[in-house]
């Protein structure tokens, strides 16, 4: 009986750690997305267009080599 109780507690602790890990990952992804969208918002549309154009030219030039 005691061994079963200990095993159940260990299983509960492992489940708790797994759930907490998932929550931490979700929070980090959320913060990352917020930071990315905030940076995009601060750059403005014209800057984003310029960056996209430069990136497109870089990719095309890389493929032509």
From Swiss-Prot:
Location in the cell: Cell inner membrane
Gene that encodes it: safA
GO CC annotation: plasma membrane
Name used for this protein in its record: Two-component-system connector protein SafA
Species classification: Bacteria, Pseudomonadati, Pseudomonadota, Gammaproteobacteria, Enterobacterales
Family classification: Belongs to the SafA family.
Role of this protein: Connects the signal transduction between the two-component systems EvgS/EvgA and PhoQ/PhoP, by directly interacting with PhoQ and thus activating the PhoQ/PhoP system, in response to acid stress conditions.
InterPro entries reported for this sequence: SafA (IPR031411)
UniProt keyword list: Cell inner membrane, Cell membrane, Membrane, Signal-anchor, Stress response, Transmembrane, Transmembrane helix
Organism: Escherichia coli O157:H7
